[in-house]
């Protein structure tokens, strides 16, 4: 599912989930507004993102943005799932992961955040699968 999908699904359906583990999350929704049809990034191209999020100009203001979901759930007084995040310090997604961690902290949402050397690959994810599972069952 990926880290973004885990966050989006767990937050959107927070009554069904008590914990979310998100590794190397593609939290790039803020960057999509400026994409043009000919643009691409290391993950995908404009058409891919438009197919997933619809109008890229408004995506960051809608509930496809995990930040919007957090704000909505907090405003409604709903309990949020606990969140475990990990991202490699050399991963091209490190800055959006740090920004989301900071957003959660500023919003008063606890987050077990982990960062260590690594890129966006299975070597890094394998390092954090066991700790994430231990955290989930602990």
Where do the PLM segments sit?
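Non-catalytic cap/lid and distal C-terminal segments of serine-dependent acyl enzymes
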Residues: 1-138
């Amino acid at each position: 599912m990926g880290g973004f999908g885990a966050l989006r699904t767990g937050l959107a359906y927070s009554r069904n989930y008590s914990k979310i583990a998100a590794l190397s999350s593609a939290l790039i929704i803020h960057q999509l507004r400026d994409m043009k049809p000919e643009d691409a990034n290391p993950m995908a191209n404009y058409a891919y993102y438009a197919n997933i999020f619809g109008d890229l100009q408004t995506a960051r203001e809608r509930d496809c943005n995990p930040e919007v979901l957090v704000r909505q759930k907090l405003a409604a007084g709903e309990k949020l799932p606990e969140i475990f995040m990990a991202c490699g310090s050399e991963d091209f997604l490190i800055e959006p992961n740090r920004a989301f961690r900071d957003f959660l902290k500023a919003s008063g949402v606890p987050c077990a955040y982990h960062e260590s050397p690594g890129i966006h690959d299975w070597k890094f994810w394998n390092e954090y699968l066991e700790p994430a599972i231990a955290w989930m069952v602990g």
